[in-house]
């Protein structure tokens, strides 16, 4: 059995800090959607007392359960699992939304699960469709080479899929479903989406 690297790094882990930085003060509950190996959920647990990770893949959840017992691990589809609406102060997702078939229905579901005053924080993948997107891709390639040489690339066990939506599609859908959301293109082929649910 191979030893785990001293520092786990890949494109998704690189942006966990973007999620942790927007956890609301006093947050008590968090949901990690598409938790996979559970790395983000375990980091959230350092800031939030009650963390739930949900994923439809039983195999990747086995790895998560082995590493952390102080998180509630659920096997299921976030779109249909009977989670209590408006019950999470943080709803986070990294590299998951593009796996789900209906982007706007997914964003609506995440908003439904978010408590008033709570935050949705997404790091997602999308397709490049504009010149500016391709410029980010070039910058991301250079950054990847530098960071991969420094840390190596940790391969997660969760399945992967190409993103069906463009960055423009995601930005427009977020504006429709989550008014006031902030959207930002990131290097390393990712975007960040953050939204705070109104309190009334």
Give each language-model segment a name:
Residues 28-36:
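Conserved class I S-adenosyl-L-methionine
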